[in-house]
Amino acid sequence: MSLSDFNQGIYLVITTEVDKKNASKLADLLLREKLIPCVTFKNVESHFWWKGEINQSKEVQLMIKCKEENVNKVRNKISEWHSYELPEIIYFRVSANKNYHQWVNSI
């Protein structure tokens, strides 16, 4: 892997879903379309303002890894298939070790 290969960044995209079933559906869609190489689930509790009230909810957080050229497609698929009216979609470029970087960009 040359230095120029690291210019093809990798992104971490974070979203939450209402439950494991919906999180799995979204993950499977992204994986089947080969937009991502992997996704990690974590149970979380969110506290937030929604429609003028403070709410709290148990959710499943998805930590989605993808190559730079797919980040917009991933964001669009999340928006299209998400169960929430206003899904959380946070994304940022990340650094990774050489072998992991290469693997993410190979998918």
Predicted regions and their residues:
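Positively charged, small/polar-rich N-terminal and surface patches that mediate targeting and assembly
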Residues: 1-107
